[in-house]
Structures are given as structure tokens and as C-alpha cells.
């Protein structure tokens, strides 16, 4: 007589436990990704500020324009920079808001910042 081999299959409860564990792990990863995405946006905004500062100060060093004139025409200065491809995008932070470009208290240097980055650094 031949004995039939019995296949062992996964029960419904075992399958539900596995799916629940996958959901819990996925939720934890998604929660941690939110912080990483925010840090990435802060980094991108800081890099944009640094690039805009470099472009505007190079214009100040090479041209006969004052810092006030450069601030007034910052869009055209950044767009016409030969080593910058998409100048308009540099003048925005990672959230799509305009960067703030102004003179420092002494009036001899530029201060470039993003309101969102400053508010997140205060927290």
C-alpha cells in the first residue's frame, strides 16, 4: 500500500501574522523616512543659499555694481551666471519658497537664508 504524502500548507492565521509584521515594519520605516526627507530638504536649501551667495559675490567682485543693486537684480544676475544652469531654481528653497537675500547689519556683506530652514533650526 502506498502512503500518500500530506502537504503542509500555511494556515490563514500564519499568513495574517506575517502580513501584520510586514505592515508594522513598513510603518516604522515610513515614519523614519519622514525625518530623512526633511533633513534632505534642509540640506538642499542650504546648498542653494551657498551657491546664490557665491554667484552674487562674484558679480560684486567683478562688476561695478553695489551690493544693493545686485540684490535688486538678483534674478538676472543668477540667470546670467555662466556656471549656473537653472538660476531661477536656485533662488527657491526645497519647499518652493523664495530665498531671502539682504545686506548684513554693516552693509558690507550679503545674508541669504530660507525662512523654513531657520524655523526648523530653532526647534
From Swiss-Prot:
It is a peripheral membrane protein. Pfam families: N_methyl. Gene3D superfamilies: Glycoprotein, Type 4 Pilin. GO terms for cellular component: cell outer membrane. Keywords: Cell outer membrane, Membrane, Signal. SUPFAM superfamilies: Pili subunits. Residues 1-30 form the signal peptide. NCBIfam families: IV_pilin_GFxxxE. This is Putative outer membrane protein CPn_0818/CP_1053/CPj0818/CpB0847. It comes from Chlamydia pneumoniae.
Amino acid at each position: 500500500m502506498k502512503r500518500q504524502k500530506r502537504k503542509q500548507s500555511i494556515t490563514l492565521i500564519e499568513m495574517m501574522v506575517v502580513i501584520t509584521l510586514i505592515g508594522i515594519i513598513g510603518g516604522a520605516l515610513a515614519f523614519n523616512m519622514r525625518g530623512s526627507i526633511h533633513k534632505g530638504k534642509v540640506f538642499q536649501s542650504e546648498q542653494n543659499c551657498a551657491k546664490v551667495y557665491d554667484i552674487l559675490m562674484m558679480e560684486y567682485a567683478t562688476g561695478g555694481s553695489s551690493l544693493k543693486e545686485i540684490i535688486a537684480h538678483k534674478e538676472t544676475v543668477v540667470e546670467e551666471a555662466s556656471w549656473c544652469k537653472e538660476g531661477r531654481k536656485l533662488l527657491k528653497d526645497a519647499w518652493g519658497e523664495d530665498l531671502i537675500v539682504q545686506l548684513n547689519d554693516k552693509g558690507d556683506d550679503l545674508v541669504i537664508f530660507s525662512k523654513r530652514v531657520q524655523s526648523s533650526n530653532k526647534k
